[in-house]
Amino acid sequence: MGVEKIKAAFENGKKAFIPYVMGGDGGLEKLKERIRFLDEAGASIVEIGIPFSDPVADGPTIQRAGKRALDSGVTVKGIFQALIEVRKEVQIPFVLMTYLNPVLAFGKEQFIENCIEAGVDGIIVPDLPYEEQDIIAPLLRTANIALIPLVTVTSPIERIEKITSESEGFVYAVTVAGVTGVRQNFKEEIHSYLEKVKSHTHLPVVAGFGISTKEHVEEMITICDGVVVGSKVIELLENEKREEICELIQATKQKEEA
């Protein structure tokens, strides 16, 4: 469990496809069913969002999914219970994407205890600055749960080195300035940015924010170790276009074999 399980997703040159699902969007049974589907479809890791009322890093698709979950009365405790149940059926690593507020409101010790019980392997907290990560980092380290760092296009080299040197799991490289969401293409400087991040960390580098097509996946996979696909996966799940998710996963695997 934990850090080692995430590492294994990248071993021997494997490229990681990491889909994002919003916890409780469509109900908790739907969450479990979607995780089972993504596991069977060959996803490397599944990222599960904890819905929050003020999601500053999320684009409209993920915001709507979070609002649907909150409006239906889904709770953090309920999401943990669903993960505990589905964990008995799947081996895929779980990474939670949560804002800091739900962690503190739940009680950070209790939150991490629930993570252990649910077999959570890593956590991403987009609004937790590196300088304040000691709020939860020591507890996560003790629990063998990776605190996955985010770096951005505007992060200086020294900061990237500092952030990633003390981190575990993988580096989440944000490929656009702004919020998550589907985009048509990426600027050329994204390539040099990803190469820069790769050359300054010992961890696998995963690109995320705005990746939505097979072409995006193939482009990013040539430079880095994996991709997170969020808004597009939510749209495809909502519209029952699951074969297109399988095609995105296949694009990752084909690049791995090439």
Swiss-Prot record:
Pfam families: Trp_syntA (PF00290). It is an enzyme of class 4 (lyase). One of its GO terms (molecular function) is tryptophan synthase activity. GO terms for cellular component: cytosol. Pathway: Amino-acid biosynthesis; L-tryptophan biosynthesis; L-tryptophan from chorismate: step 5/5. The active site is at 47 (proton acceptor), 58 (proton acceptor). Its EC number is 4.2.1.20. It catalyses: (1S,2R)-1-C-(indol-3-yl)glycerol 3-phosphate + L-serine = D-glyceraldehyde 3-phosphate + L-tryptophan + H2O. Keywords: Amino-acid biosynthesis, Aromatic amino acid biosynthesis, Lyase, Tryptophan biosynthesis. The alpha subunit is responsible for the aldol cleavage of indoleglycerol phosphate to indole and glyceraldehyde 3-phosphate. Belongs to the TrpA family. Tetramer of two alpha and two beta chains. This is Tryptophan synthase alpha chain. It comes from Bacillus cereus (strain ATCC 10987 / NRS 248).
